[in-house]
């Protein structure tokens, strides 16, 4: 009896624990949703990069490629860079005008550099004299004026703040070219300074919408420090939103991260737009020309058409668009920036309903443009207006109650339906030469059938290969073929995983009530012979490496260069480097793999890299870029294979990691236990 009571009590406690855990997850999710609500509705914001770097305006000693990074890209000593402060006197700065320009453009929030990597502060900090009030003749707290004006005009004020600080004596590491001593520097003391300034920013200027961190990539910063800073900021302003650059979870310029394990509320793609949505909150930040800070010689401006279509593209994928302006040292927005923002505002005044408070497209692909959604409403953003007056909307199953032009609601549009698509009879001329918007209204939430998905670990295989088919809708059947023919109503319908033994072309299509309601999707899976393993090689643990000095924009031909150093390392790592910039490594050796399989190799690097197995280049991640991951696949026989990895670093951030995975190996850094080098006898 006691045993039975104990079991019942244990079950009750287990169920209670599960319920409490579920409730905690729901409450946590609801809290974040409430906090993120205004940001998700806004969709469009203004980024401002402004500081002492506006004084040289991108030019130093005849070179005109610089901007906000000029201290390090032009290698200007800190004491010399400080001389820009007395020259920074932006007497034409007008907070009211800046906010009006953003508001008229249709932007809902402003993010400005309170401090960039150069360490100079645009606010009155009590922790340093290296700020706009104490170090410049301007003597005005720019952040105070902007925050007050944003509140007056109904925009959210947000801060960009750099974790990296090239000016502060306790920040480490020093720049590779610097002669400034690091003796006595204390990074923990710098963290206290960083936290102190963050506290000033989130307690002295009222409610702040977003704290947009940056400069987190150097090895003195880590995930724990990022998590601590995230929690600290939220303790000061619980409703503030913080980007993913507070910690170390960001995957380079792609800006992606795992929101379940890394600190931050949203991803930050930089100068790029993801090909699809990311499954979590994200915001693309982008320049109008080629620089963030003001560069007087940069006239490579994106067109208004390009910028408006980028805004639509980003919104259709569930993201926000943070568009940058780099003001002059006088305090003015460059005229080309003003012109483009005004043109975007003109479009937004007519079409803003299709951007604000919308969610991502329900369609997998629209050849003529993009789409956004609201409850019981779809917005069709037409880039390419049909010359024949017929706009085909593939996948739209639900019948609309009405259809009309957003620019002219009185212009009604007729629709007729075929299985799996709607056809709209539109006016001959596009209402807008850049993007025309059509509104579809429904009684209930619209049903859109996406193309079926064909999923597998890889497009090539050497062992029996599993393929899965899926649809976004219920009450449908996926019919498929494996012989290259198109599916019909008589083709088998998908019920379980398909196993392939030979090269096969899989075709599938979604059916409902005996009729096809989607396009045919095709994917070919190729059976390949794995690369033969090397035999009779005498091996020792480790890898050969050669180390080089030089300035490159892409991987050089290392056969033509003399190395500075060489030796043996246990894995792919660059700790033996002698400088922080302008160096390269070449690693050679062999990798052992446990079984015949398709292996995926990944290289994360900043700057360029490549990975080869034998003579085949598997990963090409070359060129100048921020931290970026590239990958490639190759079928390998169990055993030993030659591997070569090359990497170069030009300037700025540095990153280098090599991973692999297979159908039975989860993605991981290639372990030292799998890496060897052949002895001279073997060579």
Can you name each region flagged by the protein language model?
Residues 11-22:
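Bacterial N-terminal signal peptides
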Residues 387-389, 501-504, 595-601, 638-640:
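Short tyrosine-centred short linear motifs in exposed loops/low-complexity segments
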Residues 444-544, 552-556, 562-586, 598, ...:
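Short, compositionally stereotyped local motifs that mark structural "simplifiers"
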Residues 111-114, 469-471, 591-593, 597-611, ...:
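Aromatic-lined ligand-binding clefts that engage carbohydrates, nucleic acids, or primary amines
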Residues 644-653:
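Short beta-strand-plus-loop segments that form exposed binding edges in beta-rich domains
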Residues 48, 52-99, 104, 528-595, ...:
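Extended carbohydrate-recognition surfaces in non-catalytic/accessory domains of CAZymes
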Residues 28-453:
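Mature catalytic domains of secreted/periplasmic carbohydrate-active enzymes
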Residues 2-13:
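Bacterial N-terminal signal peptides that target proteins for export
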